[in-house]
Amino acid sequence: MLRSFLARSCAVALLGLAAAGPAAAQSNIRGDATGPTTAPGFSHPEQYMHLTPVKPAPNMYPVIQHPDLEKNAADKLAALAEKTGKKPNILIFLLDDVGWMDPGFNGGGVSVGNATPEMDKIAAEGLILTSAYSTPSCSPTRATIHTGQNPLHHGILRPPMYGEPGGLDGALTMPKLLKDAGYVTQGVGKWHMGENQGSLPQNVGYDDYVGFLGVSDMYTEWRDIYFNPEVALSPERFKMMQEDNFNHYEVHCTPADTQKCENGKLIDLDYIKDLDKHWLETSLAFLDKMKGGTKPFYLYHATRGCHFDNYPSDEWAGKSMARTVYSDCLVHMDYVFGQLMKKLEDIGEAENTLVIFTSDNGPECEIPPSGRTPFRGCKGSSWEGGVRVPTFVYWKDMIAPRKSDQLFDLADILPTALSLAGYPGAKLAELFPKKTYIDGVDQTPFLVADDGLSTRRSRIYTLNQYYAAIRIDEFKGVVTGEIEDGIVQKGNIGGFSGSIFTDTGGGVVFNLYTNPQEDVSIGIRHIPMAVPLGSAAGDYMKVLFEYPPQFKVGFLSNNPPLYDVIPEGEMAIKAWLKKHGFGRFQP
């Protein structure tokens, strides 16, 4: 894969250079000489194709520098610190399987039968990011938020299921770094980043964590006679699942016990209805404790909703105009978010809290009813529908209300949060081992500065063990993509089944503005756009050789050449096999 990819990149670059020819003006049948126009409307400072990014440190992703914006943001933050006497708080509100077009602020809401007035109100007062990116599925995204790395570097390539080993174990995380910087760290909700001891919340930086360690369907699908009658109605098989080696309970995790979390209520089809209510109460109680405190706080609130299986409580069943369990859930999540924002105001911390609202991936289209996206693909794919997620950032009186399509990756949350905690730019690299690569970038100038601009020129797409694509401005070059096949009746609907992965011919480039469905490649006609895409993609391949891909959770039957041609990557998989073997893994 590497050789063919680099060969294609070089060929495209050479074609681009050959096509450029001499710089002299030319005439053609279309009329006057070619060349850039003097009309001012064609110049867009928020587009970076022509710019060269700079690495803040050798092990950090390159950025576009904005000295004036950096100073403006620093001045605003200094004034706020003088007023509050402490560092800014960080609140992350992470939804599950919610699509880009589900909330009203992205065109959904009332128009699709699930009103989201609380989300829409706060979004309108913040910065709406229309090109914010997750990874294709939940656990890789959660690990990306916590580590500032993409899946190839943190090694959680897919969700660990039913007690599989592997997770954050050994990773340096955002809550750990913030805790070291003087923050109180609270986690609430879905974990799903490993159940082994080293991956438990209290062992990666959380002072306190209340939630569950897995994912909704692990607790529900084998209990429900509608979804899995072959298990739910069988005494032997039901007992098999009851005794399976994964945690079946809501848990409370604290550093007082680093070996395990304390089990609370059993999560069954009744209690799962109340989890988001209980988790809201937990976060509200934490915020009450922070009122008037001298320490800044970090609150990570990861909802159960709206991952399948959704079982609305009596209070929320039927509340949406769509009257589906998914839309009822989303209306409930709107209420939860609104209550958290109200509490921030009540305790007087809204002016000192950066709020990041997002989803862990696109909608799960294989399990209807599901979320909505206007883009191609869904959860489990690297098409836009799988990874472009509804996102906004809010900070009362600090972030100007606006909307931007500049690039933002959820890996950027860690560098941005640590910048606010006192470690901007290259200072962040000093906190990490030199062999750890940081894929996120500090977006403080984008979020905080007046008329802020993104510091991210390009964005890497991954798909399980694949390096799938790269985006610069509105252009996306695809190296590996999912295509329909005949394995299942309906072919690829953008998820984990019914699709195969294949390398492209090297010239697949999409203009996401004119073709958001990604089905008309312009690469051969627009080779000048393919040249910088290929160059940036090649640069990241060099990064992968110096900072090799990791393998902590992945599909062993789906190992592409990327892990073969990079010796350390192949060794990571061999080390996994030596420790755990093939088949159904156990901790």
Predicted regions, residues:
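Bacterial N-terminal signal peptides
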Residues: 9-20
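Sec/Tat signal peptide C-region and signal peptidase I cleavage site
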Residues: 21-25
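Formylglycine-dependent sulfatase
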Residues: 26-502, 507, 512, 516-542, ...
